Amino acid sequence: MKTVEIRQQFLDFFEEHGHTVLPSSSLVPADDPTLLFTNAGMVQFKRVFLGEKDIGTNRAATSQKCVRAGGKHNDLEEVGRTARHLTFFEMLGNFSFGDYFKKDAIRFAWDLVTGRYGLDPERIFATVHHSDDEAAELWADDVGIPTERLFRLGDKDNFWQMADTGPCGPCSELHYDMREERTGPLTVDEFVELAEGGEIVEIWNLVFMQYDRDDQGELHPLPAPCVDTGAGLERLAAVMQGVDSVFHTDCFRPLLDRVAELVDQPYDPKLEASVGYRVLADHARAVAFLLADGVFPSSDGRGYVLRRILRRAVRHAYLLGRHEPTLVDVVDAVIDTMGDAYPDLVTRREHLLTTTRAEEERFLATIEGGMERFEELASGESGTIPGDEAFKLYDTFGFPLDLTELMAEERGYTVDVEGFEHALEEQRRRSRADRAASQPGLERGADDEEGWVVLSPVAQDFVGYELLQVKTGVRAFKVDGDRVGLRLRQNPFYVESGGQVSDTGGVSGNGWKLTVSEVTKVGNETAVWGTVEGAFPADPTEPLEVEARVAATRRDTVRNHTATHLLHAALREVLGEHVVQRGSLVAPDRLRFDFAHTGPMTSEERTRVEQIVNEAIWADHPVEIDHRAHADAVSAGAMALFGEKYGDEVRVVNIPGVSMELCGGTHARSTGRIGLFRLVSESGVAAGVRRVEALTGRGAFEYMVAKEDALAEAASVLRTTP
């Protein structure tokens, strides 16, 4: 049976048994920005299992895209060297949310594998948790598995938990005996040894979530037990197609054939070089699906894992004699073979191929120098690669640490990882020092919590979302040379965050005025800094009554910040959903937006982006701001930055039908208040990162007038018409 048929038969079977077939969720988890990638079928249902979300059905079935590379679940190191490890795979699963439990789940699994799939029941083993008498009895009495093929195992193999606390429970696994010669009953130890050796293959895991583990480790029965099952599609295909490796199934054969065509050597699994073929085939699938789901190669987070996968593939192609882009052609084969099941691969083909080729070319430009340096470092029979040298391979030649470790292991070497981390931290320290030097206020301790004279115990309240002018009191002050810092009880001044610059303005007291030139964070509060005109009280003991006024330029900043959200949405619409923010500057006089993209925008793309933003402005959409639970906001489609630390409750800036982002900045009440938007430049700032600068409102109008004046002047000199 072909892989596509195995997938469809699974979904059809469970649909016939009352399950709602749901689409795979994205590889980028919607409800959990701290999780690198979707790595199991249950990820999209996590909040359903926790009772926090209702999806309108209590039975579901899916074929879920999964990636295990980076983080807790990381199969990257094993890919190509074993018969079953993959970075990208599909997980078939059926789920019960408080509906059926062990009896039906076990019966469904048995009927599908022995009936519709036609697997030999005499070759099937079942395992249960040593404490799960109920499951053991169901396998033995209800299904009829003999005791010699039913094993009780411990927590490591047969107990599952979502986290240290919360829903958990025993699991039961189905295994298939792939041996040609079977010699009789097995002991538990023999079974485990054969399973670890790949001769007996796990094909399905049934998790019975029946307990809630508290923070003391105690288990309490759940009021509505659930079922979460997972069967690796590729592993199941290997069993049903009678092959000894997932790479020899019909879903990988076209990819291995493409690699063989590119390197001009047939694939021979007996040769050591065959590892490279398998790595290229696997990594091409991971790259294609990650790019299609909006992940973009970068230097951190998900993007860095993708870059590591790409560069591992380039290195294997290089060892196979390919010194030109190779993975891009295998990605193209992935699109051809899997595009029917996943149409996004086809619609985003150009982006997938362009990005893959660009990343390959970038690493190929430095790989030779890096390989030569590595050869010098690992010229003996064994030894250690110094940490500072591993860092140079990373920083100068683009070799991820795990790639250097892999190369070292192949030579019998180790890498001084601690030394690498020290060199990396030193670079970060220098970067922080450079940033501090460029911010003299911070360098002088403007963010230091010491030295403040506290006049009021009342905590500060930020009122800057609603008010630009407020009468309030000074709750603390600090004199630092010729500068004075004030912490106001009610503070209208925005402190630089999320790309938006700090406010300026003034604070007036009885006979004195402070001109605000800098705003900083001091603990959880905000301080305004500046020079004082007049006589600031020498030794106040009670809160000083003042009037704080934010400069009118805040209105321009507000326009630019809302325009930045419109720009982000327009770039994603025109260039693709791989576009994500890499940095921004929101100032009164301009806005700057850095984003992930491979190459320069065409003039047509720039014009289209401008048009989309201006149409949104002229439509005068309301800008809605509310606070929600983080998971609810992300589930509703709000854009969140991976790696950003968000609280349980987040601030959502929503322009209905146009944009929804998590954002703490200040915004216009409606898009119409922006007035006008104009792109003024577009350039590259780093590998795979583009930058656009733009103007809004009066600034955009004045820019256009200046351009027209310059054009008219040039036409006059040339005695022609513009």
Give residue ranges: language-model regions:
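A glycine- and charged-residue-rich anion-binding loop/surface
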Residues: M1-P722
